[in-house]
UniProtKB/Swiss-Prot annotation:
One of its GO terms (biological process) is ribosomal large subunit biogenesis. Keywords: Cytoplasm, Initiation factor, Nucleus, Protein biosynthesis, Ribosome biogenesis. It comes from the Eukaryota. The lineage of its organism: Eukaryota, Discoba, Euglenozoa, Kinetoplastea, Metakinetoplastina. This is Eukaryotic translation initiation factor 6. It is found in: Cytoplasm; Nucleus, Nucleolus. GO terms for molecular function: ribosomal large subunit binding; translation initiation factor activity.
Length: 248
C-alpha cells in the first residue's frame, strides 16, 4: 500500500517522518492530517509517535533507524530521548551520537540488515550504527553524492536510487544490500528520493505530487503489492519497462 500525503505545503514526506518495521516517527507540531494518514495505516501494527529532535521538525533528516534501533544526533534533548524510549517498543534501542555530520537521515540509509553510510562519518559513529541497528555498514556514494540517505530508500525487499546512478553502481549496491535495485524518482521527477518517500516492508508514504507511474515503481521494487509474482529478473525488467514508458 502506498499513500500520498503532504506536510503543510511540503511534499517532502521523508523530511518530516521516519518509518521502520517496528515504529513510525512523525514530526510534532504540524498538521493533524499528516499524522492521521500514518496513524490510520499503521496504528494497528506499530506505534506512531509524535516527536521533535533538538526542537526541530525535520526529524527524517536528523535520524536513522530500523526495527532494532534508532540513532539520533547530539542535538536531541534529554527530554526527547526519554520520550522516545518511553514510546518505542522495548526491543528498540535508542542511542544518541556525537557526530559532526548530524543530519544522520541524509548520511545513512538502512534496512534491518545493512546500512550504507556517508564516506566521512566518524569511525565511532559507524560502530554505534553497527551496534544499535545490528547491521553491516558500507561506506559508499550514490550518483557521486555522499548523501546516501537523500538519494536512496531501502526496505528488506528492494532499493530505489537516484535516477542518474550508473548501472555498475546499482549492481554494487544490490550486491551490498542483497536486494534488487532500481533507479527512479518521486514527487513528479524529483531525484531526492529520501526526502519524498518513506517505506517499510508493507507500506509507503510519498508526496502528493508523486505520479501513478512513480507509485507503480515504488510498489514493485519494494514488493508492497500482494499480486506481485515472478522472479527477480522479471521484476527488474518490468520496472525498467515502466520507467521507459514514463520517459517516452
Amino acid at each position: 500500500m502506498t499513500l500520498r500525503t503532504r506536510f503543510e505545503s511540503s511534499d517532502d514526506v521523508g523530511v518530516f517522518s521516519r518509518l521502520t518495521n517496528a515504529y513510525c516517527l512523525v514530526t510534532a507540531g504540524g498538521s493533524q492530517n499528516f499524522y492521521s494518514v500514518f496513524e490510520q495505516e499503521l496504528a494497528n501494527h506499530i506505534p506512531v509517535v509524535y516527536t521533535s529532535i533538538g526542537g526541530s521538525r525535520v526529524i527524517g533528516r536528523l535520524t536513522c533507524g530500523n526495527r532494532h534501533g534508532l540513532v539520533v544526533p547530539s542535538i536531541a534533548t534529554d527530554q526527547e530521548l526519554q520520550h522516545l524510549r518511553n514510546s518505542l517498543p522495548d526491543s528498540v534501542k535508542v542511542q544518541r551520537v556525537e557526530e559532526r555530520l548530524n543530519a544522520l537521515g541524509n548520511c545513512v540509509v538502512c534496512n534491518d540488515h545493512v546500512a550504507l553510510i556517508h564516506t566521512d562519518l566518524s569511525r565511532e559513529t559507524e560502530e554505534i550504527l553497527r551496534d544499535t541497528l545490528q547491521v553491516q555498514t558500507f561506506r559508499t556514494s550514490i550518483a557521486e553524492n555522499a548523501l546516501v540517505g537523500s538519494y536512496a530508500v531501502v526496505n528488506n525487499k528492494g532499493c530505489m536510487v537516484h535516477p542518474k546512478t550508473p548501472a555498475q553502481d546499482m549492481d554494487e549496491i544490490a550486491s551490498l544490500l542483497q536486494v534488487p535495485v532500481v533507479a527512479g524518482t518521486i514527487n513528479r521527477g524529483n531525484a531526492a528520493i529520501g526526502s519524498g518517500l518513506v517505506v517499510n516492508d508493507w507500506a509507503a508514504f510519498c508526496g502528493l505530487n508523486t505520479t501513478a507511474t512513480e507509485i507503480t515503481v515504488v510498489e514493485r521494487i519494494f514488493q508492497l503489492r500482494r499480486d506481485l509474482g515472478g522472479d527477480e529478473p522479471n521484476l527488474l525488467q518490468q520496472l525498467r519497462d515502466t520507467l521507459v514508458d514514463e520517459l517516452a
